């Protein structure tokens, strides 16, 4: 099996056309009505996957439940084994989780696009994934850009976790409320980081576009309508900052309530290269289930793209792919890799992971006394963390064949 995969990767690499042979500023994917057009003039229908959990850890992809955001996972690891070993783990995790082999494999499966979720802290000196200064966000993205260029894949940069938190749930790695919309300081940082990213990649045709904020403004809050009214103005502010340095790349705008509500948008003509992005988990796999997305796409005459979909049966996914292709909504399934199934590449759960790591993550540690009482066996806990990092390496993961087939990437 492993030889077959490596052979396929090699043949994919050798057979890939030089999609990105030129770097002139005219060589970018562009918006044309409801379609995306490649530099060669051909239509681009997005098909691919998300590199979730790599630069934006989420608890369930580690097999954790109550410890479910990046800062919670990091705190749990530091409490268990100390900050220095936590930093060692995070570096190994980042080095192993996504590599050149992963990107070539994704291409070989038939994908043309990858969505890369990331945390804004990767572009600050805030404590994040083992670093407290000189964060490595650009280094990590530069690597993926190079691998995507080699494979012939487009890349969408998705700020999954924004300053202050844009969602109000674990997925934004914040503090339970979308403070981004009430903090001028956070908004300035949000726009500044996007401008820095755009300035670095302004001449890079591998980049399809910049997705400003993942799943902003959850439905939990009594003042959600007031928050929703602030979404479009903040998007415009960020677009303005980006356009000061990058006039070319597409900018992707997600709706509120898990990227499913678009009624708060009233102006879609303020920039010539914007598109919208929706998400869908659950519900019937029918055209009627995404009628609101289709209607908004038709109203704006701009592309609509399903940035996240998945975590369902193979049959449901295959049927939804047929629907999305029929209505011209491209897609990237979530996620590419995690513990267990429902992904392209499964990570083997280390032996004793549940009884030691998961159990510790659910043990009360709200006081220093509880913290001391919960302290695990150091050698055992450290070995399990490093085994998880090793198991996440491409050569140690397992392709989920039926899942991959359900994505319709080669059809």
PLM regions and their residue ranges:
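Aromatic-rich peripheral "rim/lid" segments of glycoside hydrolase catalytic domains that contact
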Residues: 316-411
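Short acidic, Pro/Gly- and aromatic-enriched capping/linker segments at domain boundaries
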Residues: 22-35
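Active-site mouth of glycoside hydrolases
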Residues: 32-46, 50-250, 255-264
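A short, polar/charged loop/turn motif at coil->beta-strand junctions and beta-hairpin connectors
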Residues: 23-25, 40-45, 270
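Extracellular glycoside hydrolase catalytic/binding regions
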Residues: 26-29, 188-338, 343-360
């Amino acid at each position: 099996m492993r030889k077959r995969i490596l052979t396929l990767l090699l043949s994919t690499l050798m057979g890939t056309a030089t999609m990105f042979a030129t770097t002139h500023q005219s060589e970018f994917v562009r918006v044309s009505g409801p379609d995306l057009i490649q530099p060669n003039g051909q239509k681009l229908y997005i098909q691919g996957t998300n590199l979730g959990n790599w630069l934006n850890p989420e608890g369930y992809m580690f097999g954790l439940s109550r410890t479910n955001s990046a800062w919670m996972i990091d705190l749990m690891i530091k409490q268990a084994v100390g900050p220095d070993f936590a930093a060692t783990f995070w570096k190994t995790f980042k080095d192993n989780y996504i590599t050149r082999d992963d990107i070539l494999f994704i291409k070989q499966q038939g994908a043309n696009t990858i969505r890369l979720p990331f945390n804004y802290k990767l572009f600050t000196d805030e404590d994040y994934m083992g670093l407290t200064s000189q964060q490595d966000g650009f280094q990590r993205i530069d690597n993926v850009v190079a691998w995507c260029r080699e494979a012939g894949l487009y890349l969408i940069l998705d700020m999954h976790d924004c300053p202050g938190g844009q969602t109000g749930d674990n997925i934004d790695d914040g503090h339970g409320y979308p403070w981004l919309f009430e903090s001028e300081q956070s908004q300035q940082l949000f726009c500044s980081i996007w401008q820095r990213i755009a300035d670095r990649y302004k001449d890079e045709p591998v980049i399809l576009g910049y997705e400003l904020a993942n799943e902003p403004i959850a439905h939990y809050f009594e003042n959600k309508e007031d928050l929703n009214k602030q979404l479009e103005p903040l998007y415009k502010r960020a677009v303005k900052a980006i356009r000061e340095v990058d006039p070319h790349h597409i900018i992707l705008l997600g709706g509120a309530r898990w990227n499913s509500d678009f009624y708060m948008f009233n102006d879609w003509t303020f920039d010539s290269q914007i598109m919208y992005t929706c998400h869908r988990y659950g519900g019937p796999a029918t055209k009627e289930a995404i009628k609101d997305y289709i209607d908004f796409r038709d109203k704006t005459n701009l592309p609509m793209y399903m940035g996240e979909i998945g975590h369902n049966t193979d049959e449901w996914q295959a049927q939804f792919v047929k629907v999305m292709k029929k209505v011209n909504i491209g897609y990237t399934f979530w996620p590419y890799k995690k513990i267990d199934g429902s992904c392209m590449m499964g990570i083997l759960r280390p032996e004793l992971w549940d009884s030691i790591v998961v159990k510790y993550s659910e043990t009360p540690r709200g006081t220093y006394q509880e913290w001391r009482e919960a302290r695990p066996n150091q050698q055992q806990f450290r070995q399990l963390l490093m085994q998880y990092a090793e198991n996440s390496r491409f050569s140690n993961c397992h392709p989920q064949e039926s899942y991959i087939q359900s994505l319709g990437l080669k059809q």
